[in-house]
Amino acid sequence: MRWSDAQEEKLISAIHPLLVRGWSSRAPLAAAFLAALAILSPASKAQTAATPASSNTAAPAHKHPAADPAPSAPVKTIGNHTAPITMEVFSDYQCPSCGNFYETTLRSMIQDYVASGKVYLVHHDFPLQMHNYSGQAARWANAAAMVGQFPEVDAALFDNQAKWTADGDLEKYVATGLSPANFKRVQAILKGCTGPAPTSKVDHTLPQPEAGCPVDPYIIQDIVLGTQVPVQATPTFVIHYKGQSYPASSGFITWPILKQFFDTLLSQ
């Protein structure tokens, strides 16, 4: 499917009140986009169509193998949402600086301050048009997030960035972070994702979701959010603490320096 002009207007209108307030809340802004997405989604109609008619006749009992739970909206977060500090990161999985930022800064932060409940990490996809595979990588991450495996695939993508950037075999390296059963679930979600993945455009036009690809709208909502921040380069991060939000910063920062900043906030 393609976004119509009316749909684009509804999406922007739904999030506009939050955007004009700026980054004034510590709560992740992705929730606003999920609400906006619901405006455009025919979910309620589909649910009605899928609801069986009531009957007074009891259906015969059958034993079936337990089915995999239906995938839900992707949760691309690590840590406890009640942590005093929230850090939102806009990232491109193929961006070398993003890979370096993850390996040398975010990994240590996750092991130390996220694990201890001090920081809540929120990932936003901002795949750049200049990278051949960044949009596809975002699809894998979102599909994994739909089945509760985001941290595992997030790490697998960054750990193997140089390899899949060279050979384009994302599937092989994503599999290293998942059990065989979870990998099959992720593959099933992406079954209809055969065309080009959405990426941020140089001219800032809104990318179009592929019909039959359930993860594309979530990537697009991150791109729209990043454009409004605005994201000028990847990685870009925004930090929230006690109702205060600190302006978006781009580029690389070491963990010791970031940790010192967090400690200063926590001491207030």
Question: Over which residues does each language-model region extend?
Answer:
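Conserved S/T- and glycine-rich ATP-binding loop of Class I adenylate-forming
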Residues: 87, 95, 237
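N-terminal signal peptide c-region/cleavage motif recognized by signal peptidases
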Residues: 41-43
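Structural alpha/beta surface segment adjacent to cysteine/selenocysteine redox centers
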Residues: 83, 91-179, 229, 268
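Compositionally biased, proline/threonine/alanine/serine-rich low-complexity intrinsically disordered stretches
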Residues: 46-65
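C-terminal cap of thioredoxin/glutaredoxin-like
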Residues: 3, 8, 12, 19, ...
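Bacterial N-terminal signal peptides
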Residues: 28-39
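A short beta-strand-turn-helix
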Residues: 68-85
